């Protein structure tokens, strides 16, 4: 995962009052943090906007990831963390050309 994406996501979670472990190269850590803090993040995502800086692809991906997280929360996290990670990784690979 691109370091700037990990940094933006970590800052967003931190702004929501959530400390998360980012020791994996996929998005498992993110979806575990979201699931473990679903009520807190629901409120945060409904009341804030998050401006990203950087290149267009990074901004596009981070905002798309935020939309995916919001939808997942709206569906009470019924899909597994693994399914959500696979979705995020698939889109990440397509956008950034990573195998």
PLM feature segments, named:
Residues 1-99:
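Alpha-helical bundle regulatory/interaction domains
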């Amino acid at each position: 995962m691109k370091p700037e994406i990990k940094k933006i996501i970590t800052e967003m979670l931190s702004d929501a009052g959530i400390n998360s472990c980012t020791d994996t190269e996929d998005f498992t850590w993110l979806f575990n943090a979201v699931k473990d803090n679903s009520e807190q993040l629901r409120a945060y995502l409904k009341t804030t906007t998050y401006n990203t800086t950087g290149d267009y692809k990074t901004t596009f991906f981070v905002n798309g990831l935020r939309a995916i997280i919001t939808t997942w929360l709206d569906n009470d996290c019924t899909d597994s963390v693994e399914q959500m990670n696979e979705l995020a990784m698939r889109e990440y690979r397509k956008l950034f050309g990573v195998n």
